Amino acid sequence: TPPXEXPPPPQXVXL
C-alpha cells in the first residue's frame, strides 16, 4: 500500500 493512500472507505458509504 502506498504511504500516501489510506485504506478504502467503509462499505456503507459507498453504498
From Swiss-Prot:
It comes from the Bacteria. Keywords: Secreted. It is found in: Secreted. GO terms for cellular component: extracellular region. Its main location: secreted. Immunodominant for delayed-type hypersensitivity reactions in guinea pigs. This is Proline-rich protein. It comes from Mycobacterium bovis (strain BCG / Pasteur 1173P2).
